[in-house]
Amino acid sequence: RVLGNAQFRKEMLELNVPSGIYSMIAGIDLVCVGEDEWYVLEDNLRVPSGVSYMLENRKMMMRLFPDLFSAHRIAPVAHYPDLLLETLRQGAPDAQEDPTVVVLTPGLYNSAYFEHAFLAQQMGVELVEGKDLIVEDDTVYMQTTHGKKRVDVIYRRIDDDYLDPEVFNADSMLGVRGLMRAYRAGRVTLANAVGTGVADDKSIYPYVPDMIRFYLGQEPILHNVPTHICSEADSLSYVLDNLEKL
């Protein structure tokens, strides 16, 4: 299922991801089915999106319903950008003390551009497009009014296919030519890593609990929504016998 997945990237074979971290940001969709009973509906590890709307929604709720927040123990979320920046900085290659972090956006016309700009502003980092970055000697640089500045961590909001025209879609005008060379050389960190979209796939989703047990030796804290893979005989038989209930 992994090798046949459209998001599987053979370009990542034998590539040592900086700091060994593939997914720094995960967007996990949850559904509540009862009191204190939550299920994981979906895993989003490729280019998770939507957190800015949650942050803005919370600000509005606090202004409109202050009594609600004073009467209940509602966990704060305003510090999310600080946690995000700290996470990105910790993933920098070469153990640099003051790494340069940027947010890479497809541009103004992308549907999530507001979030890209919002997070960059909240973290105090540069919002860049592919044309703002260049690769020289397997190192990524940002072109500024003061000259070139090395980039250590890229929080990329661009899909794999458009990241590097040397490696993926040759017609891409959104990515950075040579980015994968710098990535393979361990000179830049991409968040999230190329190929993490495999984990988004619904054919992988049913096996996540088994992955947790195998790799962590633990029982999953949250349940998965029951999912049937019809390429497996037992699941197919169950689905055919219970179509009216599904």
For every predicted segment, state its role.
Residues R1-L246:
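Domain-scale recognition of functional cores that engage charged ligands
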